[in-house]
């Protein structure tokens, strides 16, 4: 059987991404895991952290078939443009960050990697360098030529996908269209089936308005857009429940019988998930032809090089990527 290799990108070199990768090396992984970053950066950070990690070089055409031993980490060396000081951003390294993402994403497309796991980048410093960059998700959508992707956050026991993501609240209602709801629901359903191995996923769908519109008295999006769209998709055999009031849906009675929740907007679904899985949640990009998971936290510049970082989110991101790859047909 072909080995399942995975790429991990540490993201912003002055942040905690390199620290997280080094800390993960303490434990043997079930699959070969390759850090795409500067070997010198990892060596310097390991010294700063007082960690003894063996950095094993790999390159295209020399991919490992077996996991690295505990205390070791495979590294595909990617050169920095400028030296790195933990906690100090340098726009000179912006292109380096994007090169690591390109190598990981293209490696997935070419079949070298079964999936990629990303640590946080700093969008601001990349844009300050003169490179337009709105985030991992958009970057990978462009790289893979994917028209529509879906943001889903997950923790143990709960998955929440979003119809809209980073929009001001005043713009959300206008963005809830039948076309968008259908497109996002189809992607969520397909990836639950094909990447998570759930033959007939049960999806709970939030309404947009309080009390799911209260029969049209508190808004008509449920009546005019969401319910008709769900009804059409149910005729294809999709198990869709809703639209339900969010304050009803996010209760044990409902959640224990669902595989995923579809929320209409960012702050409708994610506060519940982050409360349930604080420090142990993962961001999954659905709709891509590749597997991509990510931590759910930022670069934490103030913690870089201190040894005071929590690997919980990265471990869940790894577990999720492994699970998705193992479930793919």
Curated annotation (Swiss-Prot):
**Binding residue positions for substrate:** 136-137, 274, 283, 292
Entry keywords, A to Z: Cobalt, Cytoplasm, Magnesium, Metal-binding, NAD, NADP, Oxidoreductase, Pyridoxine biosynthesis, Zinc
Q: Which residues does the record give as a divalent metal cation binding sites?
A: 166, 211, 266
Q: Which GO terms describe its molecular function?
A: 4-hydroxythreonine-4-phosphate dehydrogenase activity; cobalt ion binding; magnesium ion binding; NAD binding; zinc ion binding
Q: What is its EC number?
A: 1.1.1.262
Regions crossing the membrane = none
Q: Where is the protein found, in the record's own terms? A: Cytoplasm
Question: Briefly, what is this protein's role?
Answer: Catalyzes the NAD(P)-dependent oxidation of 4-(phosphooxy)-L-threonine (HTP) into 2-amino-3-oxo-4-(phosphooxy)butyric acid which spontaneously decarboxylates to form 3-amino-2-oxopropyl phosphate (AHAP).
Q: How does it assemble?
A: Homodimer.
Q: What name has this protein been given in UniProt?
A: 4-hydroxythreonine-4-phosphate dehydrogenase
Name its species.
Answer: Pseudomonas putida (strain ATCC 47054 / DSM 6125 / CFBP 8728 / NCIMB 11950 / KT2440)
From the broadest rank down, the organism's phylogenetic lineage runs: Bacteria, Pseudomonadati, Pseudomonadota, Gammaproteobacteria, Pseudomonadales
